[in-house]
Amino acid sequence: MRLASSSTSLPVPAAGHHPLPLTVGVLGSGHAGTALAAWFASRHVSTALWAPADHPGSISAIKANEGVVTTEGVINGSFTVSASDDLLAVIRSSHLLIIVTRADVHDSFVSELANFNGELAEKDILVVCGHGFSMKYERQLQCKRILETDNSPTTSKLSDKKKCKVNIKEMKASFGLSCFPIHRNDVGVIDLPEDIKIIFAQLFTARIIPIPPLQVLFFSNYITHAVAAVMNIGSVRDPVNSLTKRAEQWLLELDERTPRAETGFFFYGEGSNTYVCKVQEQIDQERRKVAKACGLHLNSLLQECNDEYGTDYATLREYCLAPSPHNVHYACPDNMEHRYFSEELCSLEDIAAIATITKIEMPLTRAFINIIHAGKGNFPPTDKTSSVIGNFRSGDLIRFGATIFVKDEKMK
């Protein structure tokens, strides 16, 4: 199936308030960005795809392939998007701009968008895996509203060297969505505006749960990713040119005697064994205690995992061993700049900053922050945070959805 849409000319929306047909601009062409662009095209949504010039994703390959993205998995076929390197044209052509990139490079995307603030006044910006995007950047972007998902709506992976083919392994059964400025229904409960509900019904089949922007920041990905990555840090190869010649020779000899697995490493199935899962559950307790101090009720890590995939795993270890979607491809950090270290460090530090504001102790979480900094060579690790949330006060948290502050209340 191929949708008739030029890879060079961008669709121009009619004037007015989010008229149909909907047009979207996906900013970021990595695994998730490419998958979502193809998914939207499969749902007959006119889709433009943009990425910065130095982006390592698929944009150049898709442009060379005349905008065609081939998918396998949940959907199978070839779909055409408008691949563009002209951000202004994408902004003007789109009702909804969708940022799909690592949280640790949000700064650069915001800088690009801020150059066109005059064009953003009537635009909504959706940030996939928001990591507290609205809390950090709402003053820098003069857009209509900032929407954030708590997790990626898709589990996907670019599956060919040309980067024009993507395996969409799963589309999530549910995910949380926030809106800033916060919208409440007639009885004062946090909700989504009606026009946003209409748009998301067109984009996704998932059950979408309205949540406050603050709750997005608490999503548990950092636990499943960073904790397992740190506890398997010995599997990460030494940095290039970091070894002496003698050490390099000995490493080669070790590899010859006991070769590292040629087939790869299943990060979830092999990297999150029973002992790692126990640590993850303890860090989850710290996460939920800090959230509760802000008036937020969070499900357990295991329940969040089951909710997003519509599954009924009895234990976290069972979830990590399930064949699909996390044990379909080998995926393990190969350096300290991998997102499981660098991106999730942002989440760890954000939540630690909130813990400081709410005066809740989270020693295990802070230990992982320090270990990641130490592994990156940032000596000595300190309690100082690079998170802008470190400058917040309780009133700032209330603005983004906190309601109460309770110190040291024991989790049940």
Swiss-Prot record:
<comment type="similarity">
    <text>Belongs to the lysopine/nopaline/octopine/opine/vitopine dehydrogenases family.</text>
</comment>
<dbReference type="GO" id="GO:0016616">
    <property type="term" value="F:oxidoreductase activity, acting on the CH-OH group of donors, NAD or NADP as acceptor"/>
</dbReference>
<dbReference type="GO" id="GO:0046168">
    <property type="term" value="P:glycerol-3-phosphate catabolic process"/>
</dbReference>
<comment type="subunit">
    <text>Homotetramer.</text>
</comment>
<keyword id="KW-0521">NADP</keyword>
<dbReference type="InterPro" id="IPR011128">
    <property type="entry name" value="G3P_DH_NAD-dep_N"/>
</dbReference>
<dbReference type="InterPro" id="IPR013328">
    <property type="entry name" value="6PGD_dom2"/>
</dbReference>
<dbReference type="GO" id="GO:0051287">
    <property type="term" value="F:NAD binding"/>
</dbReference>
<keyword id="KW-0192">Crown gall tumor</keyword>
<protein>
    <recommendedName>
        <fullName>D-nopaline dehydrogenase</fullName>
        <ecNumber>1.5.1.19</ecNumber>
    </recommendedName>
</protein>
<keyword id="KW-0560">Oxidoreductase</keyword>
<dbReference type="InterPro" id="IPR008927">
    <property type="entry name" value="6-PGluconate_DH-like_C_sf"/>
</dbReference>
<keyword id="KW-0614">Plasmid</keyword>
<dbReference type="InterPro" id="IPR003421">
    <property type="entry name" value="Opine_DH"/>
</dbReference>
<dbReference type="InterPro" id="IPR036291">
    <property type="entry name" value="NAD(P)-bd_dom_sf"/>
</dbReference>
<dbReference type="GO" id="GO:0047829">
    <property type="term" value="F:D-nopaline dehydrogenase activity"/>
</dbReference>
<dbReference type="Pfam" id="PF02317">
    <property type="entry name" value="Octopine_DH"/>
</dbReference>
<dbReference type="Pfam" id="PF01210">
    <property type="entry name" value="NAD_Gly3P_dh_N"/>
</dbReference>
